[in-house]
């Protein structure tokens, strides 16, 4: 919030500059091309995998429904199925994980229990079939702001894990940093502006 408003003290400005330098040195590459097709993603990933000394370690797609299948006149469900299968194939080819964010259907907003479930994945059951792990983030305080017990609490719902158990994990969400950390009792959550304890 302070960064967006420009209300930073000298110490915070110094910190932002230092962290910006660290980010610049990270092997992080962002391609913000719109309406990327599975074939285009595969071609770019292969090229970068060859160019980098140690190859790619992870691909993040934000988000899956923004990808397109050119020339396809089929319905959106079939398109998403093709995109999902393509990402699965690319992950196997490059032997790296692909993290694909996905939209949820509007059904979540129309029921009393807002916790997302597998059937809420938008457009296709192929996502559920192809993914090795499916995680949902749920913050009850978004819907029940008056309940003090929900403050700063986030739940990671493990909807699917091909080689492990499913269930819930409770975390603390530090809003001012948009950061999830191990669960901290409410009376131990740091005041806004405190950051050193939670440095990565």
Features from the language model and the residues they span:
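Conserved inter-motif catalytic segment of the P-loop NTP-binding fold
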Residues: 1-75, 82, 109-110
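C-terminal regions of RecA-like/P-loop NTPase motor modules
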Residues: 11, 35, 39, 43-56, ...
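Conserved H-loop
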Residues: 101-103
């Amino acid at each position: 919030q302070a960064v967006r408003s420009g209300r930073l003290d000298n110490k915070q400005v110094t910190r932002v500059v230092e962290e910006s330098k660290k980010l610049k040195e990270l092997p992080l590459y962002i391609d913000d091309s719109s309406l990327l097709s599975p074939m285009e993603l595969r071609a770019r990933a292969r090229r970068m995998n060859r160019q980098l000394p140690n190859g790619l370690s992870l691909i993040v797609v934000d988000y899956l429904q923004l990808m397109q299948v050119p020339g396809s006149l089929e319905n959106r469900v079939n398109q998403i199925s093709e995109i999902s299968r393509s990402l699965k194939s690319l992950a196997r080819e490059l032997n790296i994980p692909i993290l694909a964010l996905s939209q949820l259907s509007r059904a979540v907003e129309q029921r009393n229990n807002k916790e997302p479930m597998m059937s809420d994945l938008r457009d296709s059951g192929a996502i559920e079939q192809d993914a090795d792990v499916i995680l949902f983030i749920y913050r009850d305080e978004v819907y029940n702001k008056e309940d003090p017990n929900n403050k700063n609490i986030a739940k990671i719902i493990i909807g699917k894990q091909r080689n492990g158990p499913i269930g819930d994990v409770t975390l603390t969400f530090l809003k001012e940093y948009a950061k999830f950390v191990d669960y901290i009792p409410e009376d131990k959550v740091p005041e806004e502006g405190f950051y050193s304890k939670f440095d990565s």
